[in-house]
């Protein structure tokens, strides 16, 4: 009993300790703009983060944030769920003979994966740990909660996780007859999807935003449209070079220009051959030119050499991660924060289900040393992957938070004005660090925006503009023209200025200029947008 208690305590504490060590060693832990954006939203009580985070989860986080306003609930939640997922993996290894070695490997992977600490990665880990806990243990309620939170944290991971674990799910359903647990998995998954669907369909403002955002995402997630290649087609659709360049530069907070219809026409400019790379040669080159994927494929090939897959279940477990990676390549979406968590959750599920869906081949020459050989070769591959990431992907580099006090004071001293920045990075720098438990909330402001991000046109976006007396929340640029309380914080030679000027000339036949108001620092000034004013 004591040993079991100690093991459980260690399983809970060790992953948290790893996060703490990484935080102390390498500093700032948020590596994606999205997590900072979400963190601001939760602190500010904004509970609509669809289509990415489920409505039940965000509302719950906002309620808890309101109860405990002095602490950063989202940061605690993200670190906690990241650690809990590894705690579950460690717990599931408690009966394995070589559990110490496996736990060390898990903790090394956890430490390394913190380089990609984002809500998407946490969602993959948490949902996977919940599914494995559901089938391996008699903890239906706990595992169902973990699955629900994991799938709610990033709704888009549902399909990938289910496909990756398909061999395991079918094994448990067909061989172990765990129909009831499979039904629980189906119910929880459906609950996440249905609650979001009902919320969207019963809120017209949210539905309008989701519709627009889906159209916008269709364009942004594919390779950028080259103007010269589609010049004639774009001209036929009355889409100018400046329209395309503005959109690609995330300048689209003007629905009179970037309407649903315009986005549909822009998306239809390319045929599917430009969106999806179906060339076998190109995909092979794409995958094998990636050192991490190359190591992973070697690992996949090594498994059936030493372990015989049991029927279709083992084969599916090996095929699905490769299939998902190939689909990413075809989709031209081969980004580290997507394929690395897929690799990691495959490794974890393989470790936990090795004895269930694989069996040793028992080569006479190896004389029962298959496990030792496999462990040594796997450690060599892991070392090579970490070495490559360290040398080429900056995995272990200290990052500090570049807080800009001048920007922050500008916003704090002029709270009735709306300040538009050229990039979201400048907005992040203008705010206090939210990558910690206690945030300096007195330094947080709401009166800043960019001309386009994934929250543009959300209900909270429109509410923010209404609070700042912006005349038309669907057309921020038009509202900014000749306004005294909408200002731009830009470098003196910002490319944004020319794009906005051209947009007004092409779509409204108006000549506009950015008029200097005050200096912020050596490189950045505050401007207002005025009509019919010569330079």
Give residue spans per PLM region:
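Membrane-embedded, lumen/periplasm-facing catalytic core of multi-pass transferases
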Residues: 198-236, 379-451
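Membrane-interface alpha helices of multi-pass inner-membrane proteins
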Residues: 108-110, 140-157, 161-166, 186-198
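Transmembrane alpha-helix segments characteristic
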Residues: 102-107, 309-328
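Hydrophobic, aromatic-rich transmembrane alpha-helices
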Residues: 85-91, 279-311
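Extracytoplasmic
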Residues: 396-404, 412-416, 423-483, 498-518
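Hydrophobic/aromatic-rich transmembrane helices and adjacent perimembrane loops
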Residues: 123-124, 159, 324-325, 331-355
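Extracytoplasmic catalytic/substrate-binding loops of multi-pass membrane glycan-assembly enzymes
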Residues: 19-40, 46-61, 68-72, 397-399
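Signature aromatic-anchored transmembrane alpha helix within multi-pass, membrane-resident enzymes
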Residues: 100, 180-190, 358-387
